[in-house]
Amino acid sequence: MTNLSRGLLLLEDEDFTLVENQAKTFHLSHTVSGKYSIVMFYTDTCPQCSVLKPIVLYFVGDPLLQICLVNVYDSDSQNIIPMSLKSTTPLEYVPFIVFYVNGLPFKIFDGESTLLNFKNFILQTIQEADQIPTDTAAQQSEIPSYTLGKPKSSKVCYLTYEKAY
């Protein structure tokens, strides 16, 4: 984990683990402290990542959020994709943005890449998470175990050719 500035962390393999829940499914958990965090999985070669990354970085320093970035093609992050494929948040495309509550995935951002839309996503997700008791927030995650990337989506860059079609 590399802290570039207040509120921005660069995560890598060692920052993630698979955690089994009561339903015998696995969540891709991270070790970042704080109640709320947003993790953006990206690559440097993805055009849509270049559009969305400045929007995510706008929230660096927000006292409620910890903003995290993971370059999935970085040498220190190469195990994250295979690990995620065993979880409720399979990483099959980028940008892939996950809102975490207490280190566990809670909701995936799949909206339009605008600052207003992303801000509304954050506010709505915090409201939803605050209505759930802290110890059960991850268990009631909106991310179903069968979640997959949107096929033929122009909003993402698929990590494998087979997943795009």
From Swiss-Prot:
Top-level taxon in the UniProt lineage: Viruses
InterPro entries: Thioredoxin-like_sf
Family indicated by similarity: Belongs to the IIV-6 196R family.
Record-given protein name: Uncharacterized protein 020R
Organism: Invertebrate iridescent virus 3 (IIV-3)
High-level lineage: Viruses, Varidnaviria, Bamfordvirae, Nucleocytoviricota, Megaviricetes
